[in-house]
């Protein structure tokens, strides 16, 4: 069964520019490691949309990464490569 929207503006549109947020353990260089992993999986990074912020306790770091994906498979692969990192607690 295939589900389609009557409105093409609904949902993800590919190719497109997206942003993923990741929370992980601070002090593990996730600020540089996660963008590197995304680049290796074949997505184009949007350098000006890469940022990070440490938690108030300094225990965690939140990393936001902008990237371009050509299709849903590439988007899903980007999400998966981040989830697979052992220091990543969650992705959004």
From Swiss-Prot:
Pfam families to which the protein is assigned, alphabetical: DUF493
HAMAP family in the cross-refs: UPF0250
NCBIfam families: PRK00907.1
Family to which the UniProt record says this protein belongs: Belongs to the UPF0250 family.
Name of protein: UPF0250 protein PD_0532
